[in-house]
Amino acid sequence: MATTRDYYEILGLSRDATPEDIKKSYRKLALKYHPDRNKEPGAEEKFKEISEAYAVLSDPEKRAQYDRFGHAGINGQYTAEDIFRGADFSGFGDIFEMFFGGSRRGPRGPRRGSDLQYDLYITFEEAAFGVRKDIDVPRTERCSNCSGTGARPGTSPKRCPTCGGTGQIRTTRTGLGMQFVSTTTCSTCRGKGQVIESPCPVCSGTGRVRNTRKITVNVPAGADSGMSLRLSGEGDAGDPGAPPGDLYVVLHVMEHKIFKRVDYDVISEVPISFAQAALGTDIMVDTLYGKVKMNIPAGTPTHSVFKIKEKGIQHLHGNRRGDQLVRVVIKTPTNLSHEQKRNFFASLKALSSGKNPGGEKGRYDKFTEKSKKSKGFFEKVKDAFES
């Protein structure tokens, strides 16, 4: 439509206005700017603007679309005629005629099919590397027996005898010295302008049947939970002559027993013994791409975080990969014998003096200092580990 002004602003309302508030404000403004009463320049355009705002905000479905998507949600979903159809303009003349000209209109055009949503659950690995999935989608499809017309084969729909094929019923009233014309959707043909005398036995005259279709979905590498994949034309069938709706596949990535995800980085945790942390060692770490050797320096404190470069998840747009961040957790010895305790405390005493049990000096202090410098790096993934 022509106006791009906020509909609530046009009617002087807040966004939490009730249906009664909307109707009351519209009638007040419509009486003020109706062209039959107000001959000032711009009055007719103003009347059209407030009528458009009322037509949208008085319809719960259109209002919800507007509240969520603004004018884009209305212009992309409804034709100009659809915006006004069904609104209660009684007492203010033929709004359709004022906007679109002429004293008669044709029936409403065929409507596209409804969009559908399918929730697809995939594994952590499938999201990381991409996958092809076959899904079964229940939807309405065009009836093959009547080719979507709704009429028994060999027959065809007839012009509606009630509205003469216009899809609308016009009612004229006289009051206040003026003639008012209101228009409503024909209840016989429901605005289509045609009636089916001999319905198709397969679809009962609807032109559509319920069916389940197998569809292949290509999930790209790097996909994440909440991502929506649009499959054009795979929604419900539309009216005859209108396109089908679209299918939106919403992805849900299942939790992994080892890995977590932060953006494109993979987070994991591995346990090490006190001896491994104190003396240093090489350990094998699980990644999405197999096991990788990782060095644990001598004197590594618990909760230290190490980075394994490019072992994370591939970016959706490009060939870059994230990293894997590995937090090591030192397992505390339990149920030690008396001799084991004595040896353990001897090791602690050696480490506290800047030595490790192997006799090399200074490595404990060096790695303690390195760990302190790495705290900012650890904070980046702290929430992921603690969640």
From Swiss-Prot:
<dbReference type="GO" id="GO:0031072">
    <property type="term" value="F:heat shock protein binding"/>
</dbReference>
<dbReference type="GO" id="GO:0051085">
    <property type="term" value="P:chaperone cofactor-dependent protein refolding"/>
</dbReference>
<dbReference type="GO" id="GO:0051082">
    <property type="term" value="F:unfolded protein binding"/>
</dbReference>
<feature type="binding site">
    <location>
        <position position="146"/>
    </location>
    <ligand>
        <name>Zn(2+) 1</name>
    </ligand>
</feature>
<keyword id="KW-0677">Repeat</keyword>
<feature type="binding site">
    <location>
        <position position="186"/>
    </location>
    <ligand>
        <name>Zn(2+) 2</name>
    </ligand>
</feature>
<dbReference type="GO" id="GO:0009408">
    <property type="term" value="P:response to heat"/>
</dbReference>
<comment type="function">
    <text>Participates actively in the response to hyperosmotic and heat shock by preventing the aggregation of stress-denatured proteins and by disaggregating proteins, also in an autonomous, DnaK-independent fashion. Unfolded proteins bind initially to DnaJ; upon interaction with the DnaJ-bound protein, DnaK hydrolyzes its bound ATP, resulting in the formation of a stable complex. GrpE releases ADP from DnaK; ATP binding to DnaK triggers the release of the substrate protein, thus completing the reaction cycle.</text>
</comment>
<feature type="binding site">
    <location>
        <position position="203"/>
    </location>
    <ligand>
        <name>Zn(2+) 1</name>
    </ligand>
</feature>
<protein>
    <recommendedName>
        <fullName>Chaperone protein DnaJ</fullName>
    </recommendedName>
</protein>
<dbReference type="GO" id="GO:0008270">
    <property type="term" value="F:zinc ion binding"/>
</dbReference>
<dbReference type="GO" id="GO:0005524">
    <property type="term" value="F:ATP binding"/>
</dbReference>
<keyword id="KW-0143">Chaperone</keyword>
<feature type="repeat" description="CXXCXGXG motif">
    <location>
        <begin position="186"/>
        <end position="193"/>
    </location>
</feature>
<dbReference type="InterPro" id="IPR036410">
    <property type="entry name" value="HSP_DnaJ_Cys-rich_dom_sf"/>
</dbReference>
<feature type="zinc finger region" description="CR-type">
    <location>
        <begin position="130"/>
        <end position="212"/>
    </location>
</feature>
<dbReference type="Pfam" id="PF00684">
    <property type="entry name" value="DnaJ_CXXCXGXG"/>
</dbReference>
<dbReference type="InterPro" id="IPR018253">
    <property type="entry name" value="DnaJ_domain_CS"/>
</dbReference>
<dbReference type="InterPro" id="IPR001623">
    <property type="entry name" value="DnaJ_domain"/>
</dbReference>
<dbReference type="Pfam" id="PF00226">
    <property type="entry name" value="DnaJ"/>
</dbReference>
<keyword id="KW-0235">DNA replication</keyword>
<dbReference type="InterPro" id="IPR012724">
    <property type="entry name" value="DnaJ"/>
</dbReference>
<feature type="region of interest" description="Disordered">
    <location>
        <begin position="143"/>
        <end position="162"/>
    </location>
</feature>
<feature type="repeat" description="CXXCXGXG motif">
    <location>
        <begin position="143"/>
        <end position="150"/>
    </location>
</feature>
<feature type="binding site">
    <location>
        <position position="143"/>
    </location>
    <ligand>
        <name>Zn(2+) 1</name>
    </ligand>
</feature>
<dbReference type="InterPro" id="IPR001305">
    <property type="entry name" value="HSP_DnaJ_Cys-rich_dom"/>
</dbReference>
<feature type="repeat" description="CXXCXGXG motif">
    <location>
        <begin position="160"/>
        <end position="167"/>
    </location>
</feature>
<feature type="binding site">
    <location>
        <position position="163"/>
    </location>
    <ligand>
        <name>Zn(2+) 2</name>
    </ligand>
</feature>
<dbReference type="GO" id="GO:0006260">
    <property type="term" value="P:DNA replication"/>
</dbReference>
<dbReference type="InterPro" id="IPR002939">
    <property type="entry name" value="DnaJ_C"/>
</dbReference>
<feature type="repeat" description="CXXCXGXG motif">
    <location>
        <begin position="200"/>
        <end position="207"/>
    </location>
</feature>
<dbReference type="GO" id="GO:0005737">
    <property type="term" value="C:cytoplasm"/>
</dbReference>
<keyword id="KW-0862">Zinc</keyword>
<keyword id="KW-0346">Stress response</keyword>
<keyword id="KW-0479">Metal-binding</keyword>
<dbReference type="InterPro" id="IPR036869">
    <property type="entry name" value="J_dom_sf"/>
</dbReference>
<dbReference type="InterPro" id="IPR008971">
    <property type="entry name" value="HSP40/DnaJ_pept-bd"/>
</dbReference>
<feature type="binding site">
    <location>
        <position position="200"/>
    </location>
    <ligand>
        <name>Zn(2+) 1</name>
    </ligand>
</feature>
<feature type="binding site">
    <location>
        <position position="160"/>
    </location>
    <ligand>
        <name>Zn(2+) 2</name>
    </ligand>
</feature>
<keyword id="KW-0863">Zinc-finger</keyword>
<feature type="binding site">
    <location>
        <position position="189"/>
    </location>
    <ligand>
        <name>Zn(2+) 2</name>
    </ligand>
</feature>
<comment type="subunit">
    <text>Homodimer.</text>
</comment>
